[in-house]
């Protein structure tokens, strides 16, 4: 029996494939490489010494997708594929409803047809909106503020309805906080295209000299040093969270929602200082206006994942910084030969 990983060539997907292979799962990948490169998958195989089966298919193509279910004994699906750029989703919401929501409908329809009813879904902490208290538990009220977040919430709700209609489904919804870092080999990592929107890839691009300085978005928030606080989680810890969730999804028939975070927050300046100390580099920065729509503080209560999945994040901020830097240094142009131009970068 194999695990189908949609979007398996992407940032989180490729790291998760390593942990799945290390745990002796057979892995089949469906990816259209719209925001990734097949080289990532060669490197996953190089790191693990194991082989994976790869289909270059767009999830919206149901007929092609059926072929994957016909040719393999799929036991469960980990569903990463989708677009993730918040700003792009505001400009082009229909693209996001098509590529995230419709493609998930297509996936679940095919799963149902082939009687594969175990799914682990990549959601996001973005579904919580503005938290009134901290840390954020899974039963906090949801409030989405952009089309990207709305697609995540709608998919979560859709999966609930699917379960209500047929309780032989088993569904794990994973709400990620802020994944950063890279595999310690330095062979795979986050292949940001253009100017990154997110903090860690921006820092590494300043450190390598590709960008001049970090723009710190605001220093008057009600936080220890006035800069925004987030729950950064090492991508390999996150990947392991998927293996833990997968086991539970296969064993049980229920809908589970889990925060995947470390449970502690770091400010922008704390991350910057940690990066400098982990790499012995100096990263220039300047303070700018706050980014519209940003929340001051955001961090997870990850107790449920520990109690019910037996999972918790282990890696330190220092390891996240060191690994992010190793990836950047060894791969200044990411995966180099990009196969197709991306439609999405966060
Ligand atoms: P990514 O862009 O690196 O990976 C997504 C993968 O899906 C890519 O390989 C892309 O080519 C593929 N893909 C996209 N649309 C497809 C389609 N229609 N058919 C087939 N393949 C398709 O993104 P990531 O950072 O690895 O994120 C994975 C998932 O986790 C996404 O659903 C994202 O919304 C979610 N998420 C990510 C973050 C984050 O900070 N990276 C945070 C919260 C949630
Ligand atoms: C982003 C996503 C969100 C996703 C989350 C987790 C956006 C708008 N939001 O939010 O949907 O769920 O990641 O992966 O992309 N910062 C700077 N300078 C920079 C970049 C960031 O100061 O150049 C600050 C931000 O103001 C914030 C912190 O760094 O305080 C983290 O920012 P970022 O990495 O973009 O993550 P989120 O804001 O949490």
Task: Locate each region found by the language model.
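Short-chain dehydrogenase/reductase
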Residues: 97, 145-153, 189, 193-197, ...
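C-terminal substrate-binding subdomain of Rossmann-fold SDR/epimerase-dehydratase oxidoreductases
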Residues: 202-346
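Short, flexible, glycine-rich and Lys/Arg-enriched loop motifs at helix boundaries
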Residues: 38, 178-198, 209-230
């Amino acid at each position: 029996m194999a695990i189908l990983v949609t979007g398996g060539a992407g940032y989180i997907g490729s790291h998760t494939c390593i942990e799945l292979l290390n745990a002796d799962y057979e892995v089949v990948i469906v990816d259209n490489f719209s925001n990734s490169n097949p080289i990532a998958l060669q490197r996953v195989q190089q790191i693990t010494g194991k082989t994976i089966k790869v289909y270059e298919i767009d999830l919206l193509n149901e007929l092609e997708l059926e072929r994957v279910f016909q040719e393999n004994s799929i036991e469960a699906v980990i569903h990463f594929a989708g677009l993730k750029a918040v700003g792009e989703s505001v400009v082009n919401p229909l693209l996001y409803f098509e590529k995230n929501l419709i493609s998930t409908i297509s996936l679940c329809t095919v799963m149902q047809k082939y009687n594969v009813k175990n799914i682990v879904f990549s959601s996001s902490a973005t579904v919580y909106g503005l938290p009134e208290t901290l840390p954020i538990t899974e039963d906090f009220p949801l409030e989405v503020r952009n089309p990207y977040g709305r697609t995540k919430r709608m998919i979560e709700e859709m999966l609930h309805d699917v379960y209500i209609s047929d309780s032989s489904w088993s569904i794990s919804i994973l709400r990620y906080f802020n994944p950063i870092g890279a595999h310690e080999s330095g062979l795979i990592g986050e292949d940001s295209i253009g100017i990154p929107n997110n903090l860690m890839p921006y820092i590494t691009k300043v450190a390598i000299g590709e960008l001049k300085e970090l723009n710190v978005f605001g220093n008057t928030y009600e936080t220890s040093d006035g800069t925004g606080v987030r729950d950064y989680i090492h991508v390999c810890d996150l990947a392991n969270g998927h293996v833990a969730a997968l086991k539970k999804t296969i064993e049980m028939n229920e809908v589970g929602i889990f925060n995947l975070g470390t449970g502690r927050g770091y400010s922008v300046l704390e991350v910057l200082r940690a990066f400098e100390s982990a790499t012995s580099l100096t990263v220039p920065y300047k303070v700018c206006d706050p980014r519209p729509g940003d929340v001051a503080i955001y961090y997870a209560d990850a107790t449920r994942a520990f109690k019910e999945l037996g999972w918790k994040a282990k890696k330190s901020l220092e390891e996240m910084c060191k690994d992010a830097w190793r990836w950047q240094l060894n791969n200044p142009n990411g995966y180099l030969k990009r196969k197709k131009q991306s439609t999405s970068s966060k």
